[in-house]
């Protein structure tokens, strides 16, 4: 598992392809995902050592700042992030269900990581801006008391209040 992941979300497809190329050349990172999302945005998800991921994201964010919607770097992503992104998560049972919807992909992944780290919940799915006019959503499950706790932490997190 990578020690860090980072994302750049671009407003245009052409910028996304150029940014992905710059990111791969700037540092020793693995491109996990580089694809078009709705409505014509482009998302690049990279993994690697923290310093490499940060350098890679910074290069794209700096060079294409007028076309970058959002970015993030997570130094120690929760292990449940990837199964939720790739649709392979299999929670043992579903008790209470939590759903969070965002307008950008980066904020959703940061929110999912925070939710998984601050409450005893299982991420079910992270739907990343496909088929929803650019919106993203996540579903998670946990006890009737744990799911609201995760959302309390999300509401308090400064970068997620938009």
Language-model features and meaning:
Residues 81-96:
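Short, low-order "capping/linker" segments at domain edges
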Residues 29-34, 70, 122-127:
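A short linear hydrophobic-aromatic micro-motif
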Residues 27-28, 61-68, 119-120, 155:
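A common structural junction motif
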């Amino acid at each position: 598992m990578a020690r860090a992941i980072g994302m750049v979300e671009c407003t245009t497809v052409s910028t996304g392809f150029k940014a992905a190329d710059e990111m791969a050349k700037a540092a020793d990172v693995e491109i996990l995902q580089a694809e078009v999302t709705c409505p014509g945005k482009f998302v690049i998800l990279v993994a690697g050592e923290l310093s490499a991921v940060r350098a890679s994201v910074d290069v794209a964010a700096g060079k294409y700042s007028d076309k970058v919607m959002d970015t993030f770097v997570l130094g120690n992503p929760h292990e449940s992030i990837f199964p939720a992104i790739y649709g392979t998560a299999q929670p043992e049972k579903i008790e209470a269900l939590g759903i969070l919807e965002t307008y950008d992909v980066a904020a959703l992944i940061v929110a999912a990581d925070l939710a998984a780290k601050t409450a005893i919940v299982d991420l079910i799915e992270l739907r990343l801006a496909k088929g929803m006019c650019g919106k993203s959503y996540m579903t998670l499950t946990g006890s009737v008391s744990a799911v609201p706790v995760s959302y309390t932490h999300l509401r308090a997190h400064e970068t997620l209040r938009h």
